[in-house]
Amino acid sequence: LQRRRQRQMCIRDRFTAILVTVINLCFCYPIAFYMAKVASPGTSRLLIISLIIPFWINELLRSFALRILFAGEGVINNVLLGTGLIDTGINFIAQDVALYTGLTYAYILLMIFPLYNAIESLDSNQLEAAKDLGSSTIRTHWRIVIPHAKAGIASGCTMVFMLTAGALATPVVLSSPNTYWFTQLIYQWFNMNDNWSRGSAYSILLLTISVTFVLLMMRIFKVKIGEIIR
């Protein structure tokens, strides 16, 4: 029974890591494109600085700040109650809204910058030509921008997935008391139960899953490992 629960925990956490990766990609792609091809150089530099500065603060402190925002009597609930949008407070912690938000925000730079570097190298004349030929915005992105940025997409997805799958501080702070993260289990085997063999086995399992995801990203986007780490 315990092993079955641990398998379910591992599968759930990997699904969460995939979902966070998809959310990060959908959120960061428009920002990266705007910075690379729409914004002026000055605006782009300002956005980059604005994105980097919050990450000067330790990840654990950022997680506690988000917990304060999403708490039952936190800022978000107070604003929603004050504006009359809700009648009773929402338990963002129990519903894992705070957890998904925290994990998405924690690794946002690892998605934005690979996308930004890839899109910036795209010749703007190709976008102008597509526009002159009557191509829609969605079609232009699907046929020109995304294929060109596939190495950046694969790189960003790989880093976000691996770090989300191995996260410990953010899940401990932002998850509900009933939610137990797979990395917490590994930490427990090493530091509380003093069972290094079991902890090592679980760590190897986590590493194997992460490497498998990297290989899957390489196959989906048809890129080589050198393009991902470039």
Regions found by a protein language model. Name each.
Residues 8, 171-218:
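Interhelical loop and adjacent transmembrane-helix boundary motif
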Residues 63-104, 138, 174-178:
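Membrane-interfacial helix termini and adjacent extracytoplasmic/periplasmic loops
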Residues 19-52, 68, 126-127, 141, ...:
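Transmembrane-helix boundary motif in ABC transporter permease subunits
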Residues 116-131, 200-230:
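C-terminal transmembrane helix and the adjacent membrane-cytosol boundary/short C-terminal tail
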